[in-house]
């Protein structure tokens, strides 16, 4: 029944390769559809917040995002409207999904109904390499997975650690990797001399930093 009104968007869907419904369909489904009736059309590419897009034709009405927003973040802005096969996920008309943990709903969505504007159409997941790391956005030290290809980072997602960040991370931390692309980012150590800075080698920089930190 999940596939009755579900569009065959796998070739263009960002969730392809890590979609639970796709895996179930491949493992248990038939090679072709037996559904002859016309599928119900629902809203697509809906901006429900500054960082997220919604495709209601892919939504399976699991309510994970609704419960996360209400129970974890205490930002009750998502819900279902209409009935039967016309039931759709939507956002509060006067309040977008804009809290700093909104992108976690993309992680817990089992299909491609919720997608991140930042990662949308950037790279297929099977081409990327995942590396375990720690978020450097703040002092909390959230455990993360860095998804990259050919020395370019495409996204950062939370890695479960119940002692630190559980299974979540803030949107600010997810976007923090863009600082690596900043044009003014330092690529070599520099030392201030008078009113200017001059380049120094790494051993000298490490020695100076060690001496400075040893005072504390």
Pin down the residues of each PLM region.
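Low-complexity, intrinsically disordered regions enriched in charged/polar residues
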Residues: 15-18, 147, 180, 203
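Short beta-strand elements
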Residues: 144-148, 158
């Amino acid at each position: 029944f999940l596939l009755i009104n579900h569009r065959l968007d796998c070739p263009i869907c960002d969730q392809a390769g890590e979609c639970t419904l796709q895996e179930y369909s491949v493992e248990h489904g038939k090679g072709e559809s037996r559904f002859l009736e016309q599928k119900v059309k629902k809203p697509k590419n809906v901006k429900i917040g500054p960082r997220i897009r919604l495709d209601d034709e892919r939504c399976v009405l699991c309510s994970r995002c609704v419960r996360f927003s209400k129970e974890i973040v205490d930002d009750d802005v998502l819900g279902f409207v209409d009935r039967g096969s016309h039931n759709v996920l939507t956002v509060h008309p006067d309040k977008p999904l804009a809290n700093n943990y909104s992108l976690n709903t993309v992680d817990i969505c089992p299909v491609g109904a919720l997608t991140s504007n930042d990662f949308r159409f950037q790279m297929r997941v099977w081409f990327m390499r995942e590396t375990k790391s720690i978020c450097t956005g703040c002092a909390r030290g959230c455990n993360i997975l860095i998804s990259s290809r050919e020395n370019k980072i495409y996204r950062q997602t939370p890695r479960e650690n119940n002692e630190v960040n559980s299974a979540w991370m803030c949107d600010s931390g997810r976007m923090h990797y863009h600082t690596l692309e900043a044009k003014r980012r330092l690529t070599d150590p520099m030392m201030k001399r008078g009113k200017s800075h001059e380049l120094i080698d790494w051993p000298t920089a490490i020695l100076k930093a060690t001496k400075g930190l040893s005072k504390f």
